[in-house]
Amino acid sequence: MRRLSSQLMCTAAAVRFASAGGAKKYDLFGYEVDTNTAPWIEKVKKCRYYDEAGEVLVSMNVKNCPPDLETYNATLQKIFEAPSKQEKPVENESKFCAMMDLMEEMQHRNKVKPNEESWTWVMKECVQSGQFRLGYCVAKLMEAEFKRVPEDLVKQNEANAAKAKADGKEHPSTLAQQQSLFDIKIQ
């Protein structure tokens, strides 16, 4: 009897989850997952500051609607386009760090692999902020992952590097202030 009842329970659960025909998804606990991210993407696009966009992602998770690649890309775009993290800018805020934090959440928490568009937003931020060293790293990653890098962004990054070299800011000022190991006299 126990075997029969356990088979019936398993079959009933399998039928419940399979009856969706692939349209419905269920989480680990058997709750239905909402896959309609379109209204959430619109909310992200309406945000003025990128901290608000992060709150939209939190709300999505609370409502059992995990963000997909399109939602993450819209959030990366919002981080790039927003004037600041909050209405009153936060000291030492970094859009690049915010983007990398979001990419980490994408890959490791939600198992969503960033695509070329995702990394293009990061590269655009490197170019816009003048961080040409980070731009080199992102370009190398894009070349390895996608076999191409947006040529216009590479040229703009090279222009940033050339400008920094011409201004004498090719290397961070802290390196220029450090004393060489060979210049130290030990007595």
Swiss-Prot record:
Localization of this protein: Mitochondrion inner membrane
Main location: mitochondrion
Keyword Signal tagged: no
UniProt GO molecular function: oxidoreductase activity; RNA binding
Residue span of region Disordered: 160-187
Species this protein is from: Leishmania tarentolae (Sauroleishmania tarentolae)
Its biological purpose: Putative RNA-binding protein.
Protein name: Protein P18, mitochondrial
GO cellular component term of the entry, any: mitochondrial inner membrane
Range of the transit peptide: 1-17
Keyword annotations: Membrane, Mitochondrion, Mitochondrion inner membrane, NAD, Oxidoreductase, RNA-binding, Transit peptide
